[in-house]
């Protein structure tokens, strides 16, 4: 028996969120969390969780097509706009083992969130709280304590080592923090 949301989502990763309805035939806008289109374009069976309603369900993708910076998704059995509205705001999860393998210097955000961040001298700076996509490069948000954050660009100038397996990142402290 599943007792907690953590158990329910164990082994799964959020890859998108369902936005507003599209048209009158039960379609929804799908906004990816990933820059790997093959992940989204290969969706078949998905897990949906809506944080507001606390509803979790399994759905089958009937149709998916690319629009302007987002996708239009049609779920099997959702035939009209009224039914589709129930899914707005739901996160789309897949099993982690469905993700494509990455090269050594690539990472999925979930692999580095929670990593300990250490400077060159061995001083612990904090823990990665989130990863922000800026367009030119990713930026890790390092939670120093409950009130202070450090933003570090994920570029070779600042990242010395990024060890996904051991959740440890060694960084060169940015000059603006000295």
Swiss-Prot record:
Subunit and interaction comment = Binds ribosomal protein uS19.
Give yes or no: UniProt keyword Chaperone: yes
Q: What is this protein called?
A: Ribosome maturation factor RimM
Whether rRNA processing counts among this entry's keywords is: yes
Q: Which family does it belong to?
A: Belongs to the RimM family.
Instruction: Write the record's keywords in alphabetical order, separated by commas.
Output: Chaperone, Cytoplasm, Ribosome biogenesis, rRNA processing
**HAMAP family, per database record:** Ribosome_mat_RimM
PRC barrel domain boundaries:
103-177
The UniProt comment on domains reads: The PRC barrel domain binds ribosomal protein uS19.
- Would you say which domain of life the source belongs to? Bacteria
Which PANTHER family does this one have? Answer: RIBOSOME MATURATION FACTOR RIMM (PTHR33692:SF1)
A GO CC term? cytoplasm
Q: Where in the cell is it found?
A: Cytoplasm
Recorded GO MF terms: ribosome binding
Q: Which NCBIfam families match?
A: 16S_RimM
Main location, first listed in the record: cytoplasm
Q: Name one GO biological process term.
A: ribosomal small subunit biogenesis
Supply the Pfam families for this chain.
PRC_RimM (PF24986), RimM (PF01782)
Q: Which organism is it from?
A: Thermosipho africanus (strain TCF52B)
The UniProt function text for this chain reads: An accessory protein needed during the final step in the assembly of 30S ribosomal subunit, possibly for assembly of the head region. Essential for efficient processing of 16S rRNA. May be needed both before and after RbfA during the maturation of 16S rRNA. It has affinity for free ribosomal 30S subunits but not for 70S ribosomes.
């Amino acid at each position: 028996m599943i007792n907690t949301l953590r158990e329910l989502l164990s082994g799964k990763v959020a890859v998108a969120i369902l936005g507003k309805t599209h048209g009158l035939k039960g379609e929804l806008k799908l906004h990816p969390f990933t820059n790997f289109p093959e992940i989204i374009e290969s969706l078949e069976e998905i897990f949906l969780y809506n944080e507001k309603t606390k509803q979790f369900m399994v759905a089958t993708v009937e149709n998916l097509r690319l629009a302007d910076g987002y996708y239009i998704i049609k779920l099997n059995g959702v035939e009209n706009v009224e039914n589709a509205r129930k899914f707005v705001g739901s996160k789309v999860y897949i099993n982690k083992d469905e993700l494509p393998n990455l090269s050594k210097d690539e990472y999925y955000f979930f692999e580095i969130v929670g990593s300990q961040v250490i400077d060159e001298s061995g001083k612990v700076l904090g823990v990665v709280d989130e990863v922000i996509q800026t367009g030119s490069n990713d930026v890790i948000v390092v939670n120093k304590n409950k009130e202070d954050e450090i933003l570090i660009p994920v570029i070779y100038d600042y990242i010395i080592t990024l060890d996904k397996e051991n959740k440890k990142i060694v960084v060169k402290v940015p000059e603006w923090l000295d």
